Amino acid sequence: TYQCGSGKPVVGFLAEYDALSGLSQKAGCPVQEPVREGGAGHGCGHNLLGAGGYAAAVALKDYLIKEKKDGTVIFFGCPAEEGAGSKQFIARAGYFDNVDFAYTWHPETVNEVGSRGSVAIMGANFIFDGIAAHAGGEPHLGRSALDAVELMNVGCNYLREHMIDAARIHYAYSDPGGTAPNVVQSHAVIKYEVRAPKVSQVQELFTRVVDVARGAALMTGTKMKYEITMAFSDYVPNRTLGAVVDQCMRELGAPEWTEVDYRLAAEFLRTYPRTTMVGIREKLGYYFEPEELDAALEKPLDRVIHPFNPKETAYSSGSTDVGDVGYATPTVMFHVATACLGNVGHSWQNTAFACSDIGMKGMLRAAEIMTLAAIRTMDQPAVIAKAREELKQKNGGSYH
């Protein structure tokens, strides 16, 4: 954490910096070529996210000193967003309680103040313990933890029909118990994650998943326990501050691309198979009319600022611990293009862009937007008050 200045208002900038395993890739290279085979890479652009936030914090500090204005700037370094998260723990410890508002951004393929929020999530390891036995000679003496895991999966698959359409249940085997099929496995672990638009919906669905796990243990004569590994609140952008950031984005405009940038972006877009391109076009349909999309993809770097809709009620299906900050202080996360239109996240292509000139240009524009938005907000106490009243309507007066 970096802090400077004094007095009110207190501005928070959020940074992330974790990479993703297996996504090592040479900077700006449109052919898959890892720097280190199997190594980590910034497939979500957090190197840009963190650098942009820090640049904004330093620029705002210099502005306050030059103009002899009151105000405190706090830069929050937030690890592990791709895993268990950290912002919810920072919020729970009260570090956002005295922050008047917070701004952050995320590398994307379009330029916008995201009108849509993101969903809440909760994850846990389910641990089953049974009794080992010879699977051929004495199976009746065994109690299979692996069978319990399998039955839990069956139960959760039936549960999918009886949950809201917007909910999701994901799972992955953490420890199947062993590799010998002639052993009744006495230990097995499976990880589950549950998503839904609101925290209350996640909690309700997670309780049902736990009940399924209990049933699986009962059917197999095993014992079950679970350990919660992560939980993020849903993210809803503060509509009052979203309008401020949107205006600043329109004043500064999109990153300034060159013909070299456009050609490189087109090379990356050609790395995707036809089936993926169909999905990319569908995704971009949210931003472009059909007649606009073909023209946009001829030079596939976003050149416009897409509209901010403060009345938007839809949400993306992803999750972020920025949601927990949004329940503690008025928060806005916006997007700036750092990759070709429609580029797939968590990919080697995204790592290549994150370390390219295209990525750097997007990051610097994001830093300028955050700095200007912070200055504008600090100069308008009435806007801060309105944003905080909006927060109160959402959280009831305190971080849950």
Cite the ranges covered by each PLM segment.
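Acidic/His- and Gly-rich active-site-bordering loop/insert found
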Residues: T1-H42, A51-A55, A59-G71
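Midchain, well-structured core segments that form catalytic/ion-binding scaffolds
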Residues: N98-T275, R281
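Acidic/histidine-rich catalytic neighborhood of metal-dependent amide-processing enzymes
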Residues: L48-S118, G178
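Divalent metal-coordination and catalytic microenvironments
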Residues: F13, H46, F75, I90, ...
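Glycine/charged-rich beta-loop-alpha catalytic/anionic-binding loops adjacent to active sites
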Residues: A27-G43, D129-A133, P307-F308, S347-S356
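Phosphate-handling active-site elements
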Residues: K8, A56-F75, C156-A166, D379-I384
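Zn-dependent metallopeptidase/amidohydrolase metal-coordination segment
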Residues: L269-A367, K386-H400
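Histidine-centered catalytic micro-motifs
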Residues: A15-D18, G38-G52, T104-V110, I131-H140
